[in-house]
Amino acid sequence: MASEIKKKLFWRAVVAEFLAMTLFVFISIGSALGFNYPLERNQTLVQDNVKVSLAFGLSIATLAQSVGHISGAHLNPAVTLGLLLSCQISILRAVMYIIAQCVGAIVASAILSGITSSLLENSLGRNDLARGVNSGQGLGIEIIGTLQLVLCVLATTDRRRRDLGGSAPLAIGLSVALGHLLAIDYTGCGINPARSFGSAVLTRNFSNHWIFWVGPFIGSALAVLIYDFILAPRSSDFTDRMKVWTSGQVEEYDLDADDINSRVEMKPK
């Protein structure tokens, strides 16, 4: 960990996560607010689920392509946790990424709050349970939505695969959009604890907020269990791979590395 923290490239990656997360939350939540200027007194807030889902998915795909070669473009604590459990990043990197992601989400939500201050009852896209949905059901939706996302990340960035064509960022972006199409009517679709955290902090409303951390983290852990130990087990011993948690990857910034266990890279094969 000590050697990793001294590298400029490490801190560039952390800054990249912060900046990309700020842009992601601003663009995606901005689209979810669902109102047009100038505001009219009798205007109703109509949320187009397809528009919002595409905004979330396309923003992830664009930003993953933009900063993937710098940080891996996690942009989601659940994805970061998944890659940590998959022994692809160190504990230090995971902690710093999650902090950067949460701070980025707060900054973006603060900017949105200022821009949309004239909007009455502005929730800033805060996640909560829909009417008639209990906490257990909401938790289940968040688990499933995040599971399919992290499973997609692990599969599309697996260096052992030689059958991949096209764009990994686009595939992951579509997975994010798919998760929103599933979950948006039940929980507002979290599947990203940092995104949920930013809105909750600015609105000072943490009602049912635990669901949007616990659900995605459970879904992420399940995705790693399914992919790394059932669908595509790795040949290297798990105890050896765990060394990455403290030492990091030696070649983690080598974009042309051939190591099948090296860092996730949001880059077309």
Curated annotation (Swiss-Prot):
GO terms for molecular function: ammonium channel activity; carbon dioxide transmembrane transporter activity; ephrin receptor binding; glycerol transmembrane transporter activity; hydrogen peroxide channel activity; identical protein binding; intracellularly cGMP-activated cation channel activity; nitric oxide transmembrane transporter activity. A motif (NPA 2) lies at residues 192-194. A motif (NPA 1) lies at residues 76-78. Residues 30-46, 110-133, 182-186, 200-206 are extracellular. Pfam families: MIP. It is found in: Cell membrane. Gene3D superfamilies: Glycerol uptake facilitator protein (1.20.1080.10). The chain crosses the membrane at residues 12-29, 47-65, 91-109, 134-153, 164-181, 207-224. It is a multi-pass membrane protein. PROSITE patterns: MIP (PS00221). Erythrocytes and renal tubules. SUPFAM superfamilies: Aquaporin-like. It catalyses: H2O(in) = H2O(out); nitric oxide(out) = nitric oxide(in); CO2(out) = CO2(in); glycerol(in) = glycerol(out). Residues 1-11, 66-68, 83-90, 154-163, 225-269 are cytoplasmic. Residues 69-82, 187-199 dip into the membrane without crossing it. The modification Phosphotyrosine is found at Y253. Glycans are attached at N42, N205. Keywords: Cell membrane, Glycoprotein, Membrane, Phosphoprotein, Repeat, Transmembrane, Transmembrane helix, Transport. The modification Phosphoserine is found at S247, S262. One of its GO terms (biological process) is cGMP-mediated signaling. Forms a water channel that facilitates the transport of water across cell membranes, playing a crucial role in water homeostasis in various tissues. Could also be permeable to small solutes including hydrogen peroxide, glycerol and gases such as amonnia (NH3), nitric oxide (NO) and carbon dioxide (CO2). Recruited to the ankyrin-1 complex, a multiprotein complex of the erythrocyte membrane, it could be part of a CO2 metabolon, linking facilitated diffusion of CO2 across the membrane, anion exchange of Cl(-)/HCO3(-) and interconversion of dissolved CO2 and carbonic acid in the cytosol. Belongs to the MIP/aquaporin (TC 1.A.8) family. Homotetramer; each monomer provides an independent water pore. Component of the ankyrin-1 complex in the erythrocyte, composed of ANK1, RHCE, RHAG, SLC4A1, EPB42, GYPA, GYPB and AQP1. Interacts with EPHB2; involved in endolymph production in the inner ear. Identified in a complex with STOM. Interacts (via the N-terminal) with ANK1 (via ANK 1-5 repeats). Interacts (via the C-terminal) with EPB42. Aquaporins contain two tandem repeats each containing three membrane-spanning domains and a pore-forming loop with the signature motif Asn-Pro-Ala (NPA). This is Aquaporin-1. It comes from Rattus norvegicus (Rat).
